[in-house]
């Protein structure tokens, strides 16, 4: 007897990056369901800029999306998305998103997705895991929006579980979990915007510079450095300030981490 069919999209995307001809190339992109990518861009010659696409435009209960990327030694890839990920109200089923990013020695990943918006009544579970080597380099952010504060809508009900992990040489540097349920937002000071930014490897000098850049967020932002992993966390009720500060921090860190000047992805300018 066949197992019952699952409701919702069951989608996977597996990306493999290699070095060829002095630049990073997308060697393969295997996908099932509505997850795909645009043709890579090369605004910096050897660095690969890639946009993830989810044509349905939103994620609902019962959807299961799995994204994985593997960067071979020496690769440098910047991955972003053309728009926010929207998690819509669920009648009970859970939406599940798994993201696993694996970096070989000397590989560099800039993981810069747009924000994820959780509508009231959404039921979502997200797992994002970065597997690094000691000589890998990572710049990544994770920006969550609870409800639609621009129109006065709050995350008054629903469930969100967001797990973020960073491993270096098979040792955990960061294992962080946020769980919100039924409008109880006291753990995030009732703020609708929750952000995390990660940089590896980092130094005390970078930590000081990042703290200066966080000033517009006031008391609801902080940065720490543990085992060369710089972690920025912040809360806010203003999306424009959030996005500006995250980009400012990225623009400050990028030259130090990669030796390259900041080059904004084209899609951010449209």
Swiss-Prot record:
The keyword Chaperone applies. It comes from the Bacteria. Keywords: Chaperone, Cytoplasm, Nickel insertion. It is found in: Cytoplasm. InterPro entries: UreD. One of its GO terms (molecular function) is nickel cation binding. GO terms for cellular component: cytoplasm. The keyword Cell membrane does not apply. Its main location: cytoplasm. Pfam families: UreD. UreD, UreF and UreG form a complex that acts as a GTP-hydrolysis-dependent molecular chaperone, activating the urease apoprotein by helping to assemble the nickel containing metallocenter of UreC. The complex may form in the order UreABCD, UreABCDF, UreABCDFG. The UreE protein probably delivers the nickel in a GTPase-dependent fashion. PANTHER family: UREASE ACCESSORY PROTEIN D (PTHR33643:SF1). Belongs to the UreD family. Necessary for the functional incorporation of the urease nickel metallocenter. This is Urease accessory protein UreD. It comes from Klebsiella aerogenes (Enterobacter aerogenes). The gene is ureD.
């Amino acid at each position: 007897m066949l197992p019952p069919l699952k409701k919702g999209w069951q989608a996977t995307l597996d990306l493999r990056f290699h070095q060829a001809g002095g630049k990073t190339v997308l060697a393969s992109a295997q996908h099932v369901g509505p997850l795909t990518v645009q043709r890579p861009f090369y605004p910096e010659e050897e660095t690969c800029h890639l946009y993830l696409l989810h044509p349905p435009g939103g994620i609902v209960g019962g959807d299961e999306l799995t994204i994985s990327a593997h960067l071979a030694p020496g690769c440098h890839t910047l991955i972003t998305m053309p728009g926010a990920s929207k998690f819509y109200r669920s009648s009970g089923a859970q939406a599940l998103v798994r993201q696993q990013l694996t970096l070989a020695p000397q590989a560099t990943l800039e993981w810069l997705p747009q924000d994820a918006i959780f509508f009231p009544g959404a039921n979502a579970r997200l797992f994002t895991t970065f597997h690094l080597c000691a000589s890998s380099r990572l710049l990544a952010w994770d920006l969550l929006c609870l409800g639609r504060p621009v129109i006065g809508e709050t995350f008054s009900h629903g469930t969100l579980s967001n797990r973020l992990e960073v491993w270096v040489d098979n040792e955990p540097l960061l294992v962080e979990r946020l769980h919100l349920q039924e409008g109880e937002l006291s753990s995030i000071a009732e703020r609708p915007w929750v952000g995390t930014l990660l940089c590896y490897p980092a130094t005390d000098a970078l930590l000081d510079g990042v703290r200066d850049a966080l000033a517009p967020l006031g008391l609801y932002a902080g940065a720490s450095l543990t085992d060369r992993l710089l972690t920025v966390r912040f809360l806010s009720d203003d999306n424009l300030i959030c996005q500006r500060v995250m980009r400012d921090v990225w623009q400050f860190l990028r030259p130090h981490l990669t030796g390259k000047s900041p080059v904004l992805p084209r899609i951010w300018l449209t």
